[in-house]
Amino acid sequence: MPRKGNVPKRDVLPDPIYNDKVVAKLINNIMIDGKKSIAQKICYGAFDIIREKTGKDPLEVFEQALNNVMPVLEVKPRRVGGATYQVPVEVRPERRQALALRWLVVYARERSERTMKERLAAEIIDATNNMGGAYKKKEDTHKMAEANKAFAHYRW
C-alpha cells in the first residue's frame, strides 16, 4: 500500500507477432529468469502446433480456452469470532484473466508431453474442449465457492 496516492497500473505492450496484449501476458507467465526470447519461442511454437492440430486460428482457440478457464467465483478466508470461514467472492476481471493464464501455464508444465511447446498446446486445446488440469482447477474453485455459499453473507 503506497503512502502517497495510487500507483498507476503499468500496461503490457502487445506481442510482436499477434499484436495482442493477452498473448504478451501469456509469454510473461511462461518466462523464467527473464528469458523472454525462449518464452516467445515456446508460445509461438505452441500456437503453430495448435494451428496444425485444430486447423483453426490459434488466437481464437487460445481465447476460447482462456474463457473456459476463467473463474467467476473464488473463496477467501475470513476470520469471525475465532473461526475462519471460506467466504465465496466474485473475481475481478483482471484477476480472472491472470488466474486463467497462470493455471494454463502451471498445468501445462505438469503434463507429460516431451517439449514445453507440445505441453502448452495440448493444455490450451484441452481447455478449449473443457478438459485438462486448468479447467479442472476452475471447476474445483467453483465447487469450493458453491460448498461455502452459506458464508456468503460474511462478504466485505
UniProtKB/Swiss-Prot annotation:
Keywords: Ribonucleoprotein, Ribosomal protein, RNA-binding, rRNA-binding, tRNA-binding
Coiled coil: none
Pfam family, one: Ribosomal_S7
One Gene Ontology biological process: translation
NCBIfam families linked: rpsG_bact
Function noted in UniProt: One of the primary rRNA binding proteins, it binds directly to 16S rRNA where it nucleates assembly of the head domain of the 30S subunit. Is located at the subunit interface close to the decoding center, probably blocks exit of the E-site tRNA.
Classification via PANTHER family: RIBOSOMAL PROTEIN S7
Name listed for the protein in its UniProt record: Small ribosomal subunit protein uS7
Source organism per UniProt: Acetivibrio thermocellus (strain ATCC 27405 / DSM 1237 / JCM 9322 / NBRC 103400 / NCIMB 10682 / NRRL B-4536 / VPI 7372) (Clostridium thermocellum)
The gene coding this protein: rpsG
